[in-house]
UniProtKB/Swiss-Prot annotation:
Coiled coil: none annotated. This is Fucose-1-phosphate guanylyltransferase. One of its GO terms (biological process) is L-fucose metabolic process. It is an enzyme of class 2 (transferase). Expressed at highest levels in brain, moderately in testis, ovary and kidney, and weakly in liver, spleen, heart and lung. The gene is Fpgt. One of its GO terms (cellular component) is cytoplasm. Gene3D superfamilies: Hexapeptide repeat proteins (2.160.10.10). It comes from the Eukaryota. It comes from Mus musculus.
Length: 590
C-alpha cells in the first residue's frame, strides 16, 4: 500500500510533466471551468488564467473558462452549476456531450479568508513548487489521473478543499457509471455533522481495501449524530489500520471507534448533466439559493425522500421559491443512481478560513507532511525559527536577513525590510513593510486600487479573531462590532471618525467591518501598510490617530476598485527578483 505522501508526490510529478506542454487527446481535461460571483470577479480570474498560460504554468491545449453568476439573487453553488452547464452548451454546441469537464466553484468574496478576497480562493498561494503552486494547480495535480478513466461528463469540486488519497498499484478511480459518482472519505461523526454523509448499501461479500466501489442508498446533508445512527450511516472500525481513518481536518480516529463516510467532489455523466440543463432552461432565471450537494445529491439513491426539501436549517437565506425549487429538483433526479468511490486511505482538508490556513501552513500538520509543504517556498529569506508548536511560512516573498518572522505566521507576496518584526500567528499578504513591529494575531493585506483613473494602494488590517461577517442593522448597534478585540465605537473615537451612515459602503442594511470605510488610500504600497499599521497601533495603545485626513475605503470598496493587472505586475517583479537571486546563488555555488 503506497503511503499518501508517495501517492501525492507521484501526482505532483505527473502534473509537473504536463505544465506548459500541449496535452494529448484524452490525457487531460477538455475543459476546466471556474465559477465567479460576478463579472468583476470573472475579469480578475480571466486575467490570472491568461498570465498563467503566458508563463506556461498550466497544461496547454485545454479550454479554460470562467463562468460568472448572473446579477441579482444569490443562487448558491447549485445555481452556479446550472448556469455553467448552460454556458458550456452555448460555447461548445453539440460537442459538449463528448467533453470531460472539471467545474471548480470559486464564486464569493472569501470573508473568512480575506487574503483570497481580491484574486480568488482558487488562486490562493501554497508553500509548494517553483514557481509557486496555487490552489488551481494543486487541484489539477490531485485529479491528474481522473480524465483518462472517465466518460464524458462534469466533475464538480470546490476551490478551498484538498483531497489526498492512495490506492493500490494496479487500482485507479473510474468515473464510468451512469448517474452521479461521489468520492467518500472515512471521517469522525463530528466531521460528518458539517459534511454530506453517505448511507451505503450493505455488502457482506465485499473485500475491504483502499478502494471500494459501492452504491449509495441515501445521502444525508450535514446530519445530526442521532440521524447518522438512525439512518444506518455509522460504521465500526475494521481491520485496516488506524492511519486510514483520519478525516484530514480531524485527529486520527482511535481504534474500535465509530466513523462515517463523508463527501468531497462528485461527478455526473453527460445524460444527468443534460437533464439538469434542460430543467434549468425550462425554469428560467433562478430566484433562490441552490446547494449542489444538499439539493442534488439528497435527491439520489433509492432511499431518498422529499423530507429534506422542507428543511431550511442550512440555507443562508430562505427565499419564497426555495421549497418549490427543491421539490422540483427532487422529482427530476429521483431514481438516479449515486455511485460511491470509497477511499479508505484518504484525507480531506479544508482551507477556507484564517485559522485553517495558519494551521496547515505553519503547524506540524499531516497536510504539511503529505503534500511536502515548505517553510520557505520560492523566496529570498533567512531561515525561519521553529518551535514545537510550529514554524513561520514564507511564500513568494523577499525578506531581509535582519527581519524576524515569528512561528505560526505566514508571509506571502511581500517585501519585508531589516527592521521589521512580525509577531506570532499573523498573515502578511502582498505588503511592503520597511520598518515596524507587527503585533501578534494581526492580519495585513494590501491591494492596488484604481480610483478615477489613478493608481493608489490600500491595506486592510484587523485582528485574526475579528469577525468580518458579523453585522448590525443600525448605527446604535455598532458598539457590538470589534476591531482587534476593541469596541468599534471606541476605535472610531481614536481615529477621529464619526459613526454616520457615510462611514459604511453598500446598502447600509448590514453594517460590519467588511463595509466600514476605515482603511487609508495612499500613493505607494509601503505608505499604505504604514498608515494601516498606524491605525492598528493607535487602537492597541489608545492613542489618537487622525484618519479623517485620508481618503478611506472599506474592504468591500477595495474589491470594487482593485487593479488586478497592477497586483500581478507587482508579484511578477518579486518573481523576477527572486529568480535573479537564485540564479546568482547557483552561480556562486558552482
Amino acid at each position: 500500500m503506497a503511503s499518501l505522501r508517495e501517492a501525492t508526490l507521484r501526482k505532483l510529478r505527473r502534473f509537473s510533466e504536463l505544465r506548459g506542454k500541449p496535452v494529448a487527446a484524452g490525457e487531460f481535461w477538455d475543459v476546466v471551468a471556474i465559477t465567479a460571483a460576478d463579472e468583476k470577479q470573472e475579469l480578475a480570474y480571466k486575467q490570472q488564467l491568461s498570465e498563467k498560460l503566458k508563463k506556461r504554468e498550466l497544461p496547454l491545449g485545454v479550454q479554460y473558462h470562467v463562468f460568472p453568476d448572473p446579477a441579482g439573487t444569490k443562487i448558491g453553488n447549485g445555481g452556479s452549476t446550472l448556469c455553467s452547464l448552460e454556458c458550456l452548451e452555448s460555447l461548445c454546441g453539440d460537442k459538449w456531450n463528448s467533453l470531460k469537464v472539471l467545474l471548480i466553484h470559486s464564486g464569493g468574496y472569501s470573508q473568512r479568508l480575506p487574503n483570497a478576497s481580491a484574486l480568488g480562493k482558487i488562486f490562493t498561494a501554497l508553500p509548494l513548487g517553483e514557481p509557486i503552486y496555487q490552489m488551481l494547480e494543486l487541484k489539477l495535480a490531485m485529479y491528474v489521473d481522473f480524465p483518462s478513466n472517465m466518460r464524458p461528463g462534469v466533475l464538480v469540486t470546490c476551490a478551498d478543499d484538498i483531497e489526498l488519497y492512495s490506492v493500490g498499484d494496479s487500482e485507479y478511480i473510474a468515473f464510468d457509471q451512469p448517474g452521479f459518482t461521489a468520492l467518500a472519505h472515512p471521517s469522525s461523526l463530528a466531521v460528518g455533522t458539517t459534511h454530506g454523509v453517505f448511507v451505503l448499501h450493505s455488502d457482506s461479500s465485499l473485500q475491504h481495501g483502499d478502494l471500494e466501489y459501492r452504491q449509495c442508498y441515501q445521502f444525508l446533508h450535514k446530519p445530526t449524530i442521532e440521524n447518522m445512527h438512525r439512518f444506518n450511516a455509522v460504521h465500526r472500525q475494521r481491520s485496516f489500520g488506524q492511519q486510514n481513518l483520519s478525516g484530514g481536518d480531524t485527529d486520527c480516529l482511535p481504534l474500535h471507534t465509530e466513523y462515517v463516510y463523508t463527501d468531497s467532489l462528485f461527478y455526473m455523466d453527460h445524460k444527468s448533466a443534460k437533464k439538469l440543463l434542460d430543467f434549468y432552461k425550462s425554469e428560467g432565471p433562478l430566484n433562490c439559493e441552490i446547494d449542489a450537494y444538499g439539493d442534488f445529491l439528497q435527491a439520489l439513491g433509492p432511499g431518498a425522500t422529499a423530507e429534506y426539501t422542507r428543511n431550511t436549517s442550512h440555507v443562508t437565506k430562505e427565499e419564497s421559491q426555495l421549497l418549490d425549487m427543491r421539490q422540483k429538483i427532487f422529482h427530476l433526479l429521483k431514481g438516479t443512481p449515486l455511485n460511491v468511490v470509497v477511499l479508505n486511505n484518504s484525507r480531506f482538508y479544508h482551507i477556507g478560513t484564517l485559522q485553517e490556513y495558519l494551521l496547515h501552513f505553519t503547524s506540524d500538520s499531516a497536510l504539511k507532511t503529505e503534500l511536502g509543504l515548505q517553510s520557505i517556498a520560492f523566496s529570498v529569506s533567512p531561515s525561519v525559527p521553529e518551535r514545537s508548536s510550529g514554524t513561520a511560512c514564507v511564500i513568494h516573498s523577499i525578506v531581509d536577513s535582519g527581519c524576524c518572522v515569528a512561528p505560526g505566521s505566514v508571509v506571502e507576496y511581500s517585501r519585508l525590510g531589516p527592521e521589521v518584526s512580525i509577531g506570532e500567528n499573523c498573515i502578511i499578504s502582498s505588503s511592503v513593510i520597511a520598518k515596524t513591529v507587527v503585533p501578534a494575531y494581526s492580519f495585513l493585506c494590501s491591494l492596488s486600487v484604481k480610483i478615477n483613473g489613478h493608481l493608489k494602494y490600500s491595506t486592510m488590517v484587523f485582528g485574526m479573531q475579528d469577525n468580518l461577517k458579523n453585522s448590525v442593522k443600525t448605527l446604535e448597534d455598532i458598539k457590538a462590532l470589534q476591531f482587534f478585540g476593541v469596541c468599534f465605537l471606541s476605535c472610531l473615537d481614536i481615529w477621529n471618525l464619526k459613526a454616520t451612515e457615510k462611514l459604511f459602503s453598500g446598502n447600509k442594511m448590514n453594517l460590519s467591518l467588511w463595509t466600514a470605510c476605515i482603511f487609508p488610500v495612499c500613493s505607494s504600497l509601503s505608505e499604505s501598510a504604514t498608515a494601516s499599521l498606524g491605525m492598528l497601533s493607535a487602537v492597541r495603545n489608545h492613542s489618537p490617530f487622525n484618519l479623517s485626513d485620508f481618503n478611506l475605503l472599506s474592504i468591500q470598496e477595495m474589491l470594487v476598485y482593485k487593479d488586478v493587472q497592477d497586483m500581478l505586475a507587482y508579484r511578477e517583479h518579486i518573481f523576477l527578483e527572486i529568480s535573479s537571486n537564485k540564479n546568482q546563488s547557483d552561480l556562486e555555488k558552482s
